[in-house]
Every structure is written in C-alpha cells, then in structure tokens.
Amino acid sequence: MLAELLERARADEPLWLPELHAAFLRDEGARPVILRLTLHDGTQRDFPCALPRWKNEEERRFVYEFLYAAVYNILAACSGRELRLFFDLQAPGLCALYDTLGTVFQLGEKTRRGYGKVISIAGRIARSCGGPAFRFERADLRELVPLPAPPVPAPAPLDARLRTLCKKARGLRLCGVDVGGTDIKLAASDGERLVCTKEYDWNPAAFTTVEELMEPILLLTRLMRCCLALDTAAWPPSLRTALRRDAPLPLIRRAVEETEDSLGDRIDVLDGVGLSFPDIVIGDRILGGETPKTDGMRRNEAVDYEAAFARLSGLKEALLALCRGEGRVHITNDGNMAAFTAAAELAHSAEAGRLREGVIAHSLGTDLGTGWLRADGTIPALPLEMYDLILDLGSFPSRAYAPEDLRSTRNANSGLPGALRYMGQAAAYRLAERLDPGLLDGFTVQEGGMVRIASSPRDLRKPCLEHLMALAEAGEGAAPEVFREIGGHLAVVTREMDRLLQPQAKARFLFGRFVKRPGVFALLEQGFRAGAEGVRLIPSDEGLANTPLMRALAAEPDVTVAQFGQAVGSIYFSLT
C-alpha cells in the first residue's frame, strides 16, 4: 500500500488525510494507536489511528509524517494541555516514532515554526486560563480504559433566543466590524436602521508592530461613531469622503478628528461593538498569534513577539473606551461570527427548525474561517484552525516550492502543506497557474525563481481574484475548474472536521467574497457535492437576509450580503 501511495505522491497527486486514516484503519497489519487529548478545560477525547508497517526508509518517513499530521490536526482543531499516545510499548519502531514528537513539535523552543505552531497556540491559551504547558505522554495500549460517552448537548429553543437577542438592537446605536486579510468591513446601525457601511483595504501581514494592526480598527470604529452621532443629512463632506472605499488612512483620521472636535461630548453615542477577527478568540480575547495576519510582527526581531501579541488582547478594552456608559463589546473568530450570523438569519426564517442541529459556517476569502454554534447555542472554546489543517500528504512536486511561491501547497505561516493553499484566494492563484498559467497574465511577478501575485506598487491580489471569478462565471477556459476544485477541497475539510469533531450539523453556510457571484458559488457547490455526501453547502447571500438589519443591507444597491453580512452579523453579536 505505502509503495503505491508514494508513487502517486511523486506524480503530484494528492493523498487526502481523511482517506489515509480510513485506509490505515482497515489495514489488518497496521498497528493501532489511540491519541487521547486532554483539553484546556480538563475534558478528554480519544482519536483512533493506525500506523501501517514500513519496509524502507522512504515508507518510514511517510508513516512518521502521517502521525505528525494526525497530531497537528487534533491540536489545530481542539488544542489542549496533554496528548497521551496509547500503543504497543514493545514495538521499538513505534517507541522511536514517539520519541521524535517533542523535537518535531519543538516543545522546548521559545520560537517555533512548522509543527510547533500549534504548541505556541496551546501555550497562549494555557497562559490565558492559568493552565499547564502542553506535554506528550505515552502508555501501553493494554492499559487503555475507554472514556465514557460524551454528553450530547440538549437542543435549546435557540431560534426564540436569537429572535429576542436581535430585538435588543432597538433603541441602540451599534457598530459591527469584520476584519479580514485584505480588507476591513464595517456597518453601523441606529435601532433597526442601517446607517452606513465602510470598506477599507489593508495588508496586515506586512505590519511589524501591534499598533499598526490595532490603529486602523479603532480609527474606523471612531468613523462609524461619527456617522452615528450626526443625522445623515448633516454629515460634512469630509465624513462622506472618508466613507469611500479608496479613502486613505490619513484622510480618514482628519475627518474623524474634525468631527469629534466639533461635536465634543455629543460624540458619545456608541452603545456597543461586535468584532469578527480572523484568529483564535476565546472569551473576547485574541489568543492564537500564528495566522498570516501577524507574520510581519513575528518576523520583526526588534520586538518581543509574545509581549507585542499579548497587547492585542487589549483590543476589547480599547473598543469599550469608545462606547458610552458600560457599553458592550464582544469579539469572536470570523468563522464563529459566520455561524452566529447564519443562525440569527435562520431564526427569523421558515427554516428555524434547522437550528436543532446547530450551525457550521465558513468564511471564504483571503483565508478560510470556520465557526460552530452548537444546538444549545454555545460556541465551543476551541481554536477550529481548519484553514491550517494538513489535508494532503502527497503532491510532492508542488510541495517542493517555497511557501511564498503561489505554486506551493505549503502555508506561508507554517511551511506545512495546509488547507489554506487548497481554499481561499491562495488556492485560486495556485490552481489557475497549474491549470492554465495564462489565466494569471498581467498579475504575477517572478523574483528569485518564485512566482507570486504582485502586491506593489499596486496590490493586485483582490483584482486577480475578481478576474478569475469573472472568467469562471463566464465559463472561460479552465477558470471554472479552479472553483470546482476549491469546492472539492472544502469537502475534504468537511470530512476531516467530521472525523475530528463529529458535529451534528449537516449543512455548511458559506460567507465571503467567493459567494458574491452566483455562478462561482454554483461551481463551488458542484465540487463540494461530489466529495461531501449528505452535507449541503448553502450560500449566505440575499436569500439569507431575514433580520431587519440584514434586509436593509440586502436593499442597498452598492453592497451585498455576501460582502457585508458578517459586519451586520457582528452588530447583533455585540448584544450576546
């Protein structure tokens, strides 16, 4: 079996991890391993695994990599404080493999890359709750005592709770902020009236300090507060100009400061802020620190990254300072915000009964965000870093490219063959280059043997994606296949998520730039349907606009629900 798999990998074929797990578990000669995870809250989960017997060095390396990927995905999805491996302690090959884990995952290092990324995240989460540092342990398989069956969350009247929550927006002035990898989208509301929206393009991966990351978010929130403090007819020209998408930060700052100075205490009108942030967020605190958004900070040797990133957890307090009275600020991961938004809209529809399964949603744009709202209305305190899962242990030629090369299957933040290079805009570039390099004419540059999308003097990443989506919707050449394949890759993530988390929900709601063109979503859905039997992919577009504010957004002529839906959902999330 292993020889055949390696031959396929050398031919640049993918070897999907969920299928490898299933095949190895069926192999009667494979050696069983149980991976028991102790989460940060003390609960435990078992993950069965099987390791096939190898015959040569190449096969041994492949089996080692398979186990590393299994461990990595468990920690990327769930995190935890201990992973105990139960296996035959009389098998020297397995003992030797176990002995490599501490080094490969860099337990003793301060600065980590690759597999060590999930250990850094576990450490930040542990420090936030006063827990111990992560560790590996081993035990003989014969000592394994099965865990009791986990309790099934009792379905709650989630639809009624969400409808009641959304009614709380009446009489309040609120702001929703959706932070992405290439832009920030905001929406402001006065009661059930949508006052304004704002889109600001940025490139946070290039920032070298936490202040560069926080300042635009805070300034743009102040801009929304200015708009709420004045009747629309009384907005000065400078404020209207600042709302334009192409308004630079210095112009926005001048408009905000002038408006704040003229209003004095009358600027104090903001009741709450909901913020969607593309990183691990637990208890309103941003705790991950390993996403591409903070790559520039991680590479800045002039700063202590851990100390700098810790200051980002103060974003909630900085936003609260912009609110009147006690205010209310709630922050969550972009995927969880997508799940909450979908649930709120479902609660106001004839399909509210679907909430009995809970809701899983993805935001698909620069990255892949994943969120999960359980049937009891809780958001699991899990990282859900599905964008960073290792999906493909094959495709050796594509893996050989540097992570910064658009042809590579390796994530830039970890150097590992991660899901981000199979979904989102990075996947669109990679697949377009593989299927027909001509699709990228005029958008790429070559430097040091690497191919990438030009980002200066003009950032062409978003225009390139728009170009590919337009070609795909028009049925031009290989462009449609780009998005069919991305849909198929999303199905692989779904299979791996089902294996790791066993959610009840049998639908996936999709938000983001990939949804705003119906023809592109249709292509994604084709690929997804072929690989995720029994699971529906549902677009979060105007058809999912049921709350008062989302209906108001759908009625706006120049913006779409697919683009600004999470910003509006963030408004309601501020009330949780």
Where are the language model's segments positioned?
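ATP-binding/phosphotransfer module of carbohydrate and carboxylate kinases, centering on a glycine-rich
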Residues: 1-232, 249-250, 260, 265-266, ...
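Short beta-strand-loop/turn "lid" adjacent to the catalytic site in phosphate-handling enzymes
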Residues: 88-104, 234-307, 507-517
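Proline-rich low-complexity regions
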Residues: 140-142, 278-280, 328
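Anionic group-transfer/hydrolysis microenvironments
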Residues: 180, 278, 336
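Gly/Ser/Thr-rich beta-alpha loop segments that engage phosphate groups in nucleotides
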Residues: 183, 278, 367-371, 514
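Short alpha-helical interface elements
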Residues: 211, 241-246, 298-300, 343-344, ...
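Phosphate-binding/catalytic loop of phosphoryl-transfer enzymes
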Residues: 272-274, 282-404, 413, 564-576
